[in-house]
From Swiss-Prot:
Residues 625-644 are annotated as: Disordered. NCBIfam families: mnmG_gidA. NAD-binding protein involved in the addition of a carboxymethylaminomethyl (cmnm) group at the wobble position (U34) of certain tRNAs, forming tRNA-cmnm(5)s(2)U34. NAD(+) binds at residues 273-287. FAD binds at residues 14-19. Homodimer. Heterotetramer of two MnmE and two MnmG subunits. This is tRNA uridine 5-carboxymethylaminomethyl modification enzyme MnmG. InterPro entries: FAD/NAD-bd_sf, GIDA_C_N, MnmG, MnmG-rel, MnmG-rel_CS, MnmG_C, MnmG_C_subdom, MnmG_C_subdom_sf. Belongs to the MnmG family. SUPFAM superfamilies: FAD/NAD(P)-binding domain. GO terms for cellular component: cytosol. Disulfide bonds: none annotated. The keyword rRNA-binding does not apply. It comes from Natranaerobius thermophilus (strain ATCC BAA-1301 / DSM 18059 / JW/NM-WN-LF).
Length: 644
């Protein structure tokens, strides 16, 4: 029986990492928001690894934070280990990673959502969309409730027609023992939304009391109080170590002997799996010459015995999982609490979306997270906050927000999805960002806080802290330019001690800091009256000075790139009328409908010659429009319409 559930500005379907950010962004900007989810006890669930961050992913977390999102704050409050990765490499690829207490992570996020003004949570299963004249009107739930809205964000994760596979057993289900959702997939097809079928997997969870940590290498976190959030600080929870061990010949033999029972190799798994997070059986087959693979035993929380076996995702039968785990040092008597499994699920082809994450044909319908073909909590959160912002902007009649590739990893992620599409679960990598030297995790606030403030997600107090930080950075850089060291015995000894050449003439501290061997901290020897500045400020000063030349070159590249981005393509352009385009280019341009020449240039199969033809055609359109405007102006003058 039909039941009226109410009217809302914004409805978000799904309360995973994308849905949480979308709902919070919409509500905080001022939209009356409803968040619908299959299970209110599984909000912000971490069904795979118990961690946030890592290479490229930490960049996204800090960008979400800079925009005014919640993920960074949530992990800062619930982490049980922090480690800065790639510290021996340059700042562009350094990445913060934190182990999470999964239960506390969920509890805190649920608390934040429940106490957010303008936001209401309900446990419901959405089966249908209400669409009239290509405009979203609301949703219909499994129990027949009708909820109406102006804008809708779908963040359904891996639940659509989810199928769990362990060996020769498979059944309907979502991740971590949850139920699957079936209605929406069929409804999407009814509305012409193209679907794909992807697969992902997870390792077994094992009993702590069955592990022998003496046979493993202990890995402690960093003592330095790292945090993801620029605008939030909290006391750390008790910190726990992780443990490193390795597979071996016996492990590999068991896996090879059991491949006939692997659903991955028997053809029982049809969905496409992630290239950058392969199962252990896939690793053994693809890299037969590798004698061992590293595994990390990661705690899932302070008050649980469950440990996550990172690096050993599998869908092999349970008996095989047990036998192969027991060949590993430290796991000889291991007990499995939850077996590893593969999950197949429906997702949409993301090329159907605009850069705002709104559907190209259905107004008011947004998609974010794994439904768009991505993998990872962080990638989901990045999409979620942008979808929520744009839904709220549309409700208020404001311009949409598009994050450029030169502005953030979120921009790279979304541009890749909607421009190129993906044939496998998309994972963010630093190598995907062509401007990674200026898209570092340490400067996410400098890049995106202004935008977060403009849309209403950054509070006034935090914005003033941000402005003060900018002032401190610029002031200190100018001060360093004003202080010179004159070559003398003391200075030359200092240079020699730091394995760098001596000075030949008076040189400013600013230019001395450009030397890779000299740190800002080391210069205190000659600069005892310097101001007391926090690490986040001195870090920026040092990076900006040391990499100034490289950064300037990348800024020039961005400026050239933005010229192509500024060449907008009319929405009503008919590519069949452009002579000189290749057949493939014409078909792809007609399908993807890029908004700019820059975006067209990134579509696979579009050659430089096609771009040249397109630019000539756009110039002809512009000249024709200019002539028509001039003719119209002359006509008005002759008829006296412009007289006072």
């Amino acid at each position: 029986m039909a039941y009226y559930g109410g009217n809302y500005d914004l409805i978000v379907v799904g309360a995973g990492h994308a849905g949480c950010e979308a709902a919070l962004a919409g509500a905080r900007i001022g939209a009356k928001t409803l968040l619908l989810t299959l299970n209110l006890d599984q909000i912000a669930l971490m069904p795979c690894n118990p961690a946030i961050g890592g290479p490229a992913k930490s960049h996204i977390v800090r960008e979400v934070d800079a925009l005014g999102g919640e993920m960074g704050k949530n992990i800062d409050d619930t982490a049980i280990q922090f480690r800065m990765l790639n510290t021996r490499k340059g700042p562009a690829v350094q990445a913060l990673r934190a182990q999470a207490d999964k239960i506390k992570y969920q509890e805190r996020m649920k608390y934040i959502l429940e106490n957010e003004e303008n936001l209401l949570l309900k446990q419901e299963t959405v089966n249908q969309l209400m669409i009239e004249d290509n405009q979203i009107k609301g949703v219909v739930t499994k129990d027949g409730t009708y909820y109406y809205c102006e804008q809708l964000v779908i963040t359904s994760g891996t639940y659509l027609k989810g199928r769990i596979i362990v060996g020769d057993v498979d059944y309907s289900g979502g991740p971590n023992g949850q139920q699957a959702a079936y209605g929406l997939s069929e409804d999407f097809k009814q509305h012409g939304i193209s679907l794909m079928r992807f697969k992902t997997g997870t390792p077994a969870r094992v009993y702590r009391k069955s592990l022998n940590f003496d046979e493993m290498e202990i890995q402690h976190g960093d003592d330095y109080p790292w945090r993801f959030s620029f605008y939030h600080s909290s006391e750390r929870l008790k910190q726990l170590p992780c443990y490193l061990t390795f597979t071996n010949y016996e492990t590999h033999k068991i896996i090879n002997d059991s491949l006939s029972r692997s659903p991955l190799y028997s053809g029982r798994i049809e969905g496409t799996g992630p290239r950058y997070c392969p199962s252990i059986e896939d690793k053994i087959v693809r890299f037969p010459d590798k004698s061992r693979h590293q595994l990390f035993l990661e705690p899932e929380g302070l008050n649980t015995q469950e440990y996550y076996v990172q690096g050993m995702s599998t869908s092999l039968p349970l008996d095989v999982q047990e036998r192969m785990l027991r060949t590993i040092p430290g796991l000889e008597e291991v007990e499995i609490m939850r077996p590893g499994y593969a999950i197949e699920y429906d997702c949409i082809d993301p090329t159907q979306l605009e850069l705002t994450l709104e559907h190209k044909q259905i107004s008011g319908l947004f998609f974010a997270g794994q439904i768009n073909g991505t993998s990872g909590y962080e990638e989901a959160a990045g999409q979620g906050i942008l979808a929520g912002i744009n839904a709220a902007q549309k409700i208020q009649g404001k311009e949409p927000v598009i994050i450029k590739r030169s502005q953030g990893y979120i921009g790279v992620l979304i541009d890749d999805l909607v421009t190129k599409g993906t044939q496998e679960p998309y994972r963010m990598l630093t190598s995907r960002a062509e401007y990674r030297l200026i898209l570092r995790q340490d400067n996410a606030d400098l890049r995106l806080t202004e935008l977060g403030y403009q849309v209403g997600l950054i509070k006034e107090g935090n914005y003033q802290k941000f402005k003060e930080k900018l002032e401190k950075i610029e002031s200190e850089k100018e001060r360093l330019k004003s202080i010179k060291l004159t070559p003398n015995k003391n200075v030359q000894n200092f240079m020699e001690e730091h394995n760098t050449s001596g000075l030949k003439k008076p040189t400013t501290l600013f230019h001395i800091l450009k030397r890779p061997e000299i740190s800002y901290e080391a210069l205190e020897y000659f600069d005892e009256t310097r101001p007391d500045l926090p690490l986040e400020v001195t870090e920026q000063i040092e990076i900006q000075i040391k990499y100034e030349g490289y950064i300037d070159k990348q800024v020039e590249q961005v400026q050239r790139f933005e010229k192509l981005e500024a060449r907008l393509i009319p929405d009503d352009i008919d590519y069949s009328q452009i002579s000189g385009l290749s057949i493939e280019a014409r078909e792809k341009l007609q399908t993807y409908r890029p908004r700019s020449v820059g975006q067209a240039n990134r579509i696979s199969g579009i050659d430089p010659s096609d771009i040249s033809v397109l630019m000539v055609y756009l110039e002809q359109l512009k000249q024709r429009a200019d002539r028509n405007q001039a003719s119209h102006d002359d006509s008005n003058t002759e008829t006296g319409e412009n007289d006072d």
